[in-house]
Design a protein with these regions (language model features):
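Regulatory modules of eukaryotic transcription factors, especially in plants
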Residues: 387-391
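Plant-biased, solvent-exposed loop and capping regions
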Residues: 1-383, 393-400
Length: 400
């Protein structure tokens, strides 16, 4: 009887005291007889999707409904098939993690019955279909990760009901439509990652109410919109902001320089215009600033210290009308791919020509006056020696 009083069963290289995975491991139904089981984990056990594919048993999960609090299948490429509908009977579950397996099909709507869930991770599989609206009732949820699947359809409006949520990652799917205004209810959210989807309809002002956000990643979506439409000082906790390749237009607001905790700012591959405020270079924590492939113009008046600190993590190339002032930047810190301001280059060239011309006139006068070449200074360079040789030849021709 003591065997059946097992509360934790970890199989695979999870902890030092975990059970090892047997070769060609099968999922035994005896597991469902462990009526006191609270934790069940399989890590890197089912690894051969072609030679030895394994499906999660579709029945008997209700036998663990009164005890199981954590169920995890991680890194099992040989684990195939669908999520069993009977998972919906595991009403005491606090953590459901199905990460990087070979699972397919739609996500069962009755997962929304697991109202005690604090962590729901279904990332790195091949799930399809829409995100169930029923997930909006998971009021205790803290971690919500459905990334790296093939989910489609709009973002559910019920997302706004997840008021306890800390991290929401729906990246790398095929989600489309607009960003629902209901996300403004997620006051505790610290991470929102929606990159690599098909979300559109512009930046929503709902972000302004999400004052706890530390990471906002929307890159590679046809969102569109204007940075000027948001009051960036409300997002003062941002550490990572990636809005690359989302179809932005308009100018980069000076108010973004108030994001004092910002370490990464990605605005590349958009249609941004106008000049850059020098205040962007005063962001105290920034270590990467990507502005390349836009239509920014004017002088890049960032101090030399900024380029020394950030180096190649400052990207501003492919802005044809953007330039840097020659006098403000040392040769070793020239921003990569940005040209020097042409007016300054022209002035420098003009000054150089003037000095050279004046130098030639003075040297020629000394040469003609002396006739004995005693006034000539040979430190002027080899090109001047050539000129002297030419003049000597002309002089001799006149008297021979």
């Amino acid at each position: 009887d003591g065997l059946w009083y097992v509360t934790t069963l970890n199989i695979g290289p999870i902890h030092d005291n975990s059970l090892g995975c047997a070769k060609n491991l099968e999922f035994r139904t005896q597991v469902f007889e462990l009526k006191h089981l609270k934790t069940l984990s399989f890590f890197n056990c089912f690894v051969s999707p072609k030679r030895h594919p394994i499906a999660i048993p579709s029945n008997s999960w209700d036998k663990l409904g009164g005890s199981l609090e954590s169920l995890e299948f991680r890194s099992n490429p040989g684990l195939i098939g669908k999520i069993p509908v009977s998972f919906g009977s595991l009403v005491k579950l606090k953590s459901l993690v199905l990460l990087e397996n070979g699972l397919t099909g739609n996500i069962p709507t009755n997962i929304g019955n697991l109202i005690n869930l604090k962590r729901l991770v279904l990332a790195g599989n091949r799930f399809v279909g829409w995100i169930p609206d029923s997930f909006g009732g998971l009021n205790e949820l803290l971690i919500y990760d459905l990334s790296r699947n093939t989910l489609s359809g709009p973002l559910p409006l019920t997302l706004g009901g997840l008021t306890s949520l800390l991290k929401l990652d729906l990246s790398n799917n095929q989600l489309e439509g607009m960003l629902p205004s209901e996300i403004s209810n997620l006051k505790n959210l610290t991470l929102l990652d929606l990159r690599n989807n098909k979300i559109s309809s512009g930046l929503t002002k709902s972000f302004q109410g999400m004052c706890s956000l530390e990471e906002l990643v929307l890159s590679n979506n046809p969102i569109g919109g204007d940075l000027m439409s948001l009051e960036w000082h409300n997002l003062h906790n941002l550490v990572i902001l990636d809005l690359s390749n989302i179809g932005l237009t308009g100018e980069i607001p000076e108010s973004m320089s108030k994001l004092k905790r910002l370490r990464f700012l990605g605005l590349s591959d958009n249609n941004l215009t106008g000049t850059l405020s020098p205040k962007l270079a005063t962001l105290p924590c920034v270590s990467a600033l990507y502005l390349n492939a836009n239509n920014l113009t004017g002088e890049l008046n960032f101090p030399d210290d900024f380029y020394r600190e950030v180096g190649r993590r400052f990207r501003a190339w492919n802005n044809p009308n953007l330039c840097y002032p020659v006098g403000l930047v040392s040769a070793s810190h020239v921003p990569y791919g940005v040209k020097p301001c042409q007016q300054q280059v022209t002035l420098l060239e003009h000054d150089l020509r003037t000095k050279l011309a004046n130098g030639n006139m003075n040297q020629n006068s000394q040469f003609v006056a002396s006739l004995g070449f005693t006034s000539y200074g040979f430190g002027a360079g080899i090109w001047w020696v050539s000129l002297v040789e030419m003049l000597i030849g002309l002089f001799l021709n006149c008297f021979l």
